[in-house]
UniProtKB/Swiss-Prot annotation:
Catalytic activity: ATP + H2O = AMP + diphosphate + H(+)
GO terms, biological process: dATP catabolic process; dGTP catabolic process; dTTP catabolic process; dUTP catabolic process; TTP catabolic process; UTP catabolic process
Cofactor: Mg(2+)
PANTHER family in alphabetical order: NUCLEOSIDE TRIPHOSPHATE PYROPHOSPHOHYDROLASE
Protein name: Nucleoside triphosphate pyrophosphohydrolase
Subunit architecture: Homodimer.
CDD domains found in the cross-reference section: NTP-PPase_MazG_Cterm, NTP-PPase_MazG_Nterm
Gene: mazG
GO molecular function: ATP binding; ATP diphosphatase activity; metal ion binding; nucleoside triphosphate diphosphatase activity
UniProt-annotated binding residues for Mg(2+): E174, E177, E195, D198
Cited function: Involved in the regulation of bacterial cell survival under conditions of nutritional stress. Regulates the MazE-MazF toxin-antitoxin (TA) system that mediates programmed cell death (PCD). This is achieved by lowering the cellular concentration of (p)ppGpp produced by RelA under amino acid starvation, thus protecting the cell from the toxicity of MazF. Reduction of (p)ppGpp can be achieved by direct degradation of (p)ppGpp or by degradation of NTPs, which are substrates for (p)ppGpp synthesis by RelA.
Amino acid sequence: MRYSIQDFIQLIAQLRNPNGGCPWDLKQNYESMISCLTEETYEVIEAIEKKDIPNLREELGDLLLQVVFFSQLAREDKYFAFDDVLQDVAEKIVRRHPHVFGDAKAGDETEALSRWNEMKAKEKQGKSEETSILDNVPRALPSLTRAAKLQKRCSKVGFDWEEISPVFDKVREELEEVQAEINRTSIEQNKVEEEIGDLLFATVNLARHLKCDPEDALRKANLKFERRFRAVEQAVQQQGKQVNNVPLIELDLLWDEVKKQEN
């Protein structure tokens, strides 16, 4: 059987049907499904980064399931249905691409993005009572991403360095403040945490100035570290040893060897 999107919507509705539906699905609500939504989103990202196209197909389906499930919850509460979600996003795509569906012109991607932002700004006029340039930056965003967005918003009104040098200086300053905290006779953990936070925030600003997405950069660094450490583990096992029994100096040598092989 070949399922359509309407068939799929009905499948999810049946899962939520009090008469014969699934007990687990019936117990779920908006809040309980947040972790599922987050997990499925990151699994899509992982499939893309691994260039695992067959798995990407599956993970996109799982992500679609989340969208339809949340829409079903909203339909039950008489807020909106999946068709409304689809209608809204289709209208938005048409509205924000006047250079495709209208008479506006966009010669390159910069102009196209400018058209998008112009339409987005028009939509917001009179729609909400914003009191700050920082309004509507979702607090649920990953912290690195949210930091970059906050900084970008401030940059739009001139609260930003134009040169890269003071950005580097700020990172050094925050690093020194971390060092000062841990050099105290009595270390206050909350103070250390605060200074580490400031250091991370300054580092995100450096990444932004260098046109790097901090979340992507850290994710790739995680993958690189994982790949290299797995190689170290394998090298240790080939020597008939266990990693936890190998001195750090030997592990460092193996690590350096792995790095050389990669480079």
